[in-house]
Amino acid sequence: MPGSTDATMTAWTQEQSLAERFALAVTQLNRLKGVLVRVRGRVTLGGTANEMIILHRAAGVGLHQTLPLVKALLERDIKPCRIDVGQLVGAAPAADNPLASLEQIRQEANAQDHPNAPRDVVLYGFGRIGRLLARTFIERSGPAALMRLRAVVCRPGRDPVADLRKRASLLRTDSIHGAFNATIEVDEDNLALIANGNRIPFIYAPRPDDIDYSRQGISDAILIDNTGVWKNQSGLGQHLQSQGVGKVLLTAPAKGDIPNIVYGVNDEQITGERIVSAASCTTNAATPVLAVLDRAFGIDQGHIETVHAYTNDQNLIDNFHKADRRGRAA
């Protein structure tokens, strides 16, 4: 005979209780010790009890297994790091004694050199890519963060306060990713957004080569150019002339001798370059899978079809475009 409704509800209530305690422990670990907890690669910070239950079920591990691990971490001295408790529970021989494996990870984390402060990051451009990057940096901010969003650069020309309000609205809501789970305040007097405690000044500048980022306390920053306006050494090199910029990352395929890097495929080619491209969206979508297939089986030739959303420089009508494949019907 199937279990009674009361028994099912009791089991659910107990699981919810475990999930609530797990979510609280994860939050305390991040805030107090700078430890970011994952379950089989999925970030747990900021999740609700129901989200924790769904996440654990998808990972095939139980909250009764992971909760003791995060509670043990709270009781131990540990430096900022990232720990996947789902892998600890499910991996052999760690599955026999996950606490022993946890202690080994703690010792390894404490033995590593940790930066005194996260690396400064500047977003040059705040379109769709820029806003999604901002979401990621804000979501991952905290004591364990290795990078910190310090400023955003936008084109001048409109009333800056009205522009900032609109950009805050676009950051809050995305047509694909939905509402951004963050508190966003608009500091009109100082032209800045305050997102989850991160103060992000907005700099309105017409050129990339005459901005003094050090006035915002920024130094040796990674500047992420997501405008696509400049794609070669001479154009992107203008950023390096501004005070406070250490390296430049382009979020589009580059031209000339700038290396196009797909992480996990050819990132070992990054040596002393100060300007690097993250390649195209199509390249990042296809290359990691192709690289695995090529290493395992070999690829002689192939054909790739890409289905791409229209971009913001296209009309949502049947029309011409300077790039042949972009002059298409909507």
Regions found by a protein language model. Give the residues of each.
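N-terminal Rossmann-like NAD(P) cofactor-binding subdomain of oxidoreductases
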Residues: P2-N315, A323
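Mobile gating loops/cap/lid regions near enzyme active sites that modulate substrate access
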Residues: D318-A330
